[in-house]
Amino acid sequence: MGKLHLYSGRRKRFPEKLSWAAVEGGVELEEAKAFMLSVWNSDEKSTKCIELWTKDMSMDEMKIFFHQTLLSMTETFQRATGDENMSATMQDFCDYFAEKLELRK
């Protein structure tokens, strides 16, 4: 079974440093400015989330991070459900999101 390790130098509201390792995936120890993890609780039918970002992550980086996360979720939804129509709708939203944040110039 693979393991993911997250290291957070969390002080007060924002961690000063984030790093992670996934040895089986070839990542020994890599720094990151943001991290999101969602887990599904089947008994409660609810999602639990951990969202962390460092104090030095810029607003522009956060916008790009969210956009790329939404794109990844869209791809995962398509693979998991095969629902072409909703996947296209989600992709439309990703395009709208990027346009409104002026991410694609």
Segments predicted by a language model, with ranges:
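Active-site- and interface-proximal helix/loop "cap" or "latch" segments in soluble metabolic
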Residues: 17-80
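Structured beta-strand/loop patches that form or line metal/cofactor-binding pockets in enzymes
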Residues: 1-4
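C-terminal charged interaction modules
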Residues: 74-105
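Short, acidic, Ser/Thr-enriched surface-loop or helix-capping motifs
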Residues: 9-10
